[in-house]
């Protein structure tokens, strides 16, 4: 038994290390290389088989010697079934691609090695269409209609077509819309076996957590002894400073706030969405100076200024330049530049030559140093070019909606004279009213533009309530002040709870902590709900949104467990605050965009939600581990043991959630990509994380029985979560780059 257990540990550790190495090698050698030499190689399959056989034998022997619950046996059995399904797919599945032009017929496909294989039937392309979001040019879906023998088959994103056991997945299309590329997969047995394993895993995990015979119950009772006891916290020093400088070179036109707000309600096509100008203004101003306001002026006022009072605003030093090299090339002192600072005395763009040289020489360091400044310069140029002011809709042939900016050539549009004059002159009239401060006239013109939009684009222009909601969201979404406030308060509460020696102060601290948790939860829920309503989809499509959801999930978990587990109550707001801080830092002004077609699946939303809940629990175990090490340092042995039990208890739902989340993601991938597992870097690291966190759940690992070792392990294990969420996005490659 002992030798068999050691063999399992060695093989499992080897697999984890190989997976880590493979993801690193992939970033330099490419996906095809690691797929051929590692993931699909015979020796790697043998390694997994050895782990499966050894684990199966060990479970049988262990069952005969000790009272192992049926639910725990089923968990392990489900993984064996999943591995059997994967082995079946590896040995029996076929895959390839076909490319068809309209009305073209084929009976073959090309496999990954470029070899031709017979399908056993003929398939032809009837037509291919790109379906856009209403009123925009953003693709909502790609739809291919095939004919296999005499049967018509529809293939689109998240909708696989099938015939005779072959599955067709939308993979690409020709630029002239007359051709399509489809992935073809034939896996008659592997998918069914694997899905059986998924179902068995889900049932067994739920049974394990509710069963009274599992180790989880013992850990629950042991962790409960923490209730009412003083918990230890780690103190940290937080220093927050801000500085803003505004240099006025000439008298500006003061734009009335109400007039600017009316202007902000006009809709434009921006970032493939129909959105109020207020959203564009918020994005524009935040991008330039790092915050949605400037010198006491709202984003609407500043944006209107850049449109209607150009000479003044080009002299305002409101463009934040962080890189020293960019500051040096622009000839500015400090980090604030004006648009005029980007031009030399000959009206040449100062960064043009250095950037061209950097790209020519492959100087990535200089490219990185100048990229942010160049992007801000070009955002202003985009505004001047009308890219942010496409406000006049026109429904062309087949209902395709075009949007035009003021002054943009209208081509051969069939418009009467009055309408043409309105399109060409309305912005001039609005500019005159804004500059002269004629509030009534400006409001009237803004309403006329909005009314025109509803006449010409009534099917796609947002309602007044949706516009109000989006502008309200833009105002309430400012992150810096609330995040810093939450972070400061949660740190102070952690410190106070450590220093409070009498129960009276402890009770006050707990009360304040509960109030803070509820305030943060209500605030985060409001932001997520507003973003959901405005975007039209669950806000979990990018890093900013998923970090916000992780903060929300942490707060929910805190409120659920705070009455029984004091450390969770103390650390929940702190972990949530850090999640919000990361969201703020990584994307200070996240844009709301239309979803990529492949992301329009309820399965994906559930996958992300479940995974983020598991990350929240893993984060709590890391903080509890830190607290446990402090207890060890202070020779609080009983407290140290209790905290270790709490970490292990939280691992049960955390590991269950990440396992369920991974396999829901696999089902989504199977529906969207045709494969339930493709060894993408993100899914590989999620598997690594699950394997790492599964180890402490096995009582047979003696090293982890010691509380100190358990706490160290929990801290180090969280590095895998950080790598899965951040490292893969920034350092590795894969299909999850949009996450």
Q: Model features per residue range: what roles?
A:
Residues 1-739:
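Solvent-exposed, non-transmembrane regions of integral membrane proteins
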